Amino acid sequence: MGIVAAIQTPPIYLDSMACAQRAAERIAEVAEHGAWLAVFPETFIPGDPLYHDYTAPDSEHFKALERRFAEQAITVPGPETECIAAACRAHHMTVAIGVTERPARAGTLYNTLLYFGPDGMILGRHRKLMPTFNERMVWGMGDGTTLRTIETPHAVVGGLICWENFMPLARTVLYTQGEQIHVAPTLNPGSERWLSAMRQIANEGRMWVISVGCLMRESDLPPDVAALGLFEKGAVLNAGGSAILNPNSEIVAGPAQGVETILYAEADMAETLYAKRTFDAVGHYGRSDLFGLTLRGVEIPLQIGDSSPMTQMSDHVWRVPQSVAEG
C-alpha cells in the first residue's frame, strides 16, 4: 500500500532548468502528502512543441521557436536531471518524467521518459518508439532496448508515452516483466478514446495505471512567445485530462480537465495479484504454447519466470555510471 501522484502542472515553457526546478518543487509537495511515486506529463521538460500546430514550417516564427526548442532539449545526465535527482534524494521519491533529450554528440532529439529512484539514481530511460504525425519532424524513433520496467521498493513500474500505449506488442513486453504500475505520460487532452485506452490497459494488464496529461494555457506561455500572436488570448491549449485507474479499470482519481492539480490514490499492489487470479495476459491466460513474441531477435516468453529475458539485452541498454548519478 502506498500513495501515488499524477502531477498535472504546466511547464515553464522553453526553459529547461526552470522546468526541472518546478518539478523539484512538486516532488517536495507530493512527498508531504505521503506519496512515494510522482508522475509528470510527456515532454514536461522543456514543454510540448505545440507551435507546430499553429504556424507554417517555413515561417520565421517557426524557425525561431524550433531553434529555441532544440537548444532547451537536455542531455542525460545533465544539470536538469541532477536538479530532479536531488529532490528525489531529499524526499525519498520515485519519479517518472517526460523530457526532450538531446544526445551529447548527435543532432537527433528524442521524446524520453526518465525514471529516478529515491536515492537520486536514474533507474531507466525509455525513448518513444514512434513519434505521432508531425512529431516526426521533432523527435527520432527509439529502439526496443529501452522497453524495460524498473524495480522499486513498492512495485514494478513501467510506462509508454502517449500513442505508444495503443501498441499491443509494446504493452506485452512490459507485462512480461511483471509490471504492476503502468505510467502513461501524454499530450492527449483526456478524450474519451484516451480514457478508454487507459481502462483497457488496466483491465488487460491487471495493474494500476497513472495517466498524466500536459496542461498548457496561453497564459502559461512566456511573454515573448505569447506576443507572437500564434495563440488565442486566454485559450486552453492542452487540457491535461489526467487520471489514475485501479486494476479493475475503475477511475479512482480524475479525470482533471483544464486545471492545475495533483491527483492522489492509495495504490495497493495486492489488488494486482488478486485481479490476475482471473486473467493474466502473460501467465495462465497467455497460452504460451500457441503464441510467442520477439524483440530485436530476443524471444520474450509469455510466462513470467524467475529471471527476465530482458537481461539478455543488458549490454545494449544505457545506464548512468554510479559516480555520475550520485553526483
What are these regions (language model features)?
Residues M1-A6:
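Extreme N-terminal starter segment of soluble prokaryotic enzymes
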Residues Q8-E25:
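N-terminal phosphate-binding loop and adjacent alpha-helix
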Residues S16, A28-P118, N188-G205:
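Cys-nucleophile CN-hydrolase/nitrilase-fold catalytic domain and related Cys-dependent amidase chemistry
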Residues P46, L50-D53, L114, H126-T132, ...:
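Short beta->alpha transition motifs characteristic of CBS
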Residues V76, T81-A86, M93, E101-I181, ...:
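Active-site catalytic loop in hydrolytic enzyme cores
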Residues A96, G158, W208-I210:
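Structural detector of well-ordered beta-strand residues that form the stable sheet scaffold
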Residues C214-G327:
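C-terminal beta-strand edge segments of enzyme domains
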